Amino acid sequence: DLTNFTSAVIDERAFVKLSGAIDAAKASGDAEIVAGGTYDRSKGWYIRPTLITSTNPGNDIFRTEYFGPILGIFVYDDADFDKVLDLVDTASAYALTGSILATDRAAVELAQQRLRFAAGNFYIN
């Protein structure tokens, strides 16, 4: 059914964790939900795909693996790229996947070198 944007998460425990993260972002002074941010358990454990930005690189949205449709976004100035690589490398003890999206080949090569052990799977585009 192409009218569905997402399916339910796996169980109630996952629903509680994900909806709690959304509620924490809504209550946070340094985070903003820019898309999604809703959930509904009336017919299953549905979490709308959610994008959350934060000005705080220490926000839980960047340190917790949610295994659900939540993506944390940290916007930074290009001049701070080197510092941001350090933040990415130290943000979490765990990282299932990581990715670099850039048009500057030198930035891609630097990030690839600095972050090669930062995640289990690493994508470059």
Predicted features, each with a name:
Residues 29-38:
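Short secondary-structure junctions
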